[in-house]
């Protein structure tokens, strides 16, 4: 019946031995639904998003906002954008991504502000390029808020089910750039037997593809603790020619706060003046913040943990997937840093109305009894009770070099991948990919140009370019060190960089447009005032001496004075009444003052990075033919020919970033394709 429904020319699904075949009732789609059913459910959509995690939610919201009739299919409508691991958003580089998502009209920043219980700006002691916002969130409210957004988004419908295969047709276009063995997506099929037709499909399956959870020697199928697993999709995609791999991640035990002696722990408070993620004026900073707590492991704790190593699936060969380098389990840390007698643990609240705490730094798949015994030896945890143990999870992913920069697959037209299916880790990285996939799927259906962010435009651009150009051999997470143009990609200027693009796309609300125009106008207005204002030495020397810098010998422009270390606009307002009046009369808020100061102080560095970025962009303007036979170019090294043939870069700039392609290889391409 399913094969009849798939339609002429559609590919049959590959069979899998997992799970065993079982007889089950299915919803027949042989006859059209009744009039009553038609009112409740439409079976044809422009775009279908599979998966309701952080990537899926952003993808569905963006696609619908751009006018596509969109269906979001999720296994559990009670867990939209569920915080499966730590109850926090942001952090180093990740916070910049969230600000960029917000500037582009996404929802993650707004929902984080709405549900935050603590906010901190990390790396304040470093330069502004390193400042990274991070917020603890109320886990339950975060998911509930996403559900409210989705249920109130025009053009978006939701369906609770599990997709087990896709439906495709073989490409027959004689003028297509695609090879003859490639396909075009036509829809999805679910385990309930429903066939949904679609012009584009976005897969955001997270850790659910053949997910297998481990605690000690016990294992169970599932994409997350308490949830089911998705079978069939990996096997089906592989039957179309996709390459799949296996990765691993993990999560720590959840702690009952009532069993913890908090007097033995060191509280970690939020900022006194908390900022926020969203640039929208209606999005407010957190109030009534809740502290996190710092505690340390000991040598005794480590000895107990080592007792369980023989039963650890990480060390006994049970787990084959590759784990995240930068978020290791506690047993990984003990083996890698065997000389350390102590490791930091952070106890993070999961919400305002719960006693559940997340123990950051104690991710583990050791046996339950070992976890409990070790935790009871941590100071303040002597009487600890846990709600659930830590566990590791293995899942399938698809190497992202099989994607274009739009996140569309190279093998199947109008099929997009976003999130952990691409080998990334982290809510923020997933949400960014989902947003970009949703935008690009909509644009393609409207025959509009694709939306691709360059490496000098956004961390999102760095993220996607790294994925599709370099690929991954371990779960990928973003760091500021991955970006060549960190001074251009600051968290404070994400709106100035990206909101004009959101306006052009049609993703920016009227509130966002007005806020952007006001910020841009007032920032420049304040910079102009500072540039034009002359300051006499009698006005300023007292202030300069008070902060330990040399006094003026003659009058100077205020702009030049602000370039000095230790001088700030806030400090200058205490001695220059006209500057203070100008700021208040124009209703210039702290964020605009901060932005103006950064632009002035870092002007030289900003201009230098822009010059370098423009120079590198010339290589991005030299296009490479998608059907070019690199094996015929014998001047290239063998490794370069292999890598270029597999990845098929779109430009020489992209080719230059492929590992294994040398500067000499790039010179060969420049000569062949023309400088």
For the regions a protein language model found, what residue spans apply to each?
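Extended, charge-enriched "interface" segments that sit outside catalytic cores
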Residues: 482, 488, 499-667, 671-674
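A glycine-rich dinucleotide-binding beta-alpha-beta segment and adjacent secondary-structure elements
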Residues: 358-422, 452-465, 589-643, 648
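Conserved beta-strand-loop-beta-strand element in the redox core of flavoprotein oxidoreductases
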Residues: 167-195
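Core beta-strand elements of the Rossmann-like FAD/NAD(P) dinucleotide-binding domain
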Residues: 43-45, 189-200
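An anion/pyrophosphate-binding glycine-rich loop and adjacent beta-alpha core
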Residues: 76, 235-372, 464, 469-554, ...
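Internal hydrophobic alpha-helix adjacent to the cofactor/substrate pocket in enzyme cavities
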Residues: 430-451
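Beta1/beta-strand and adjacent pyrophosphate-binding region of the FAD-binding site
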Residues: 42-55
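Conserved N-terminal/central alpha/beta ligand/cofactor-binding core
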Residues: 61-165, 169, 192, 204-224, ...
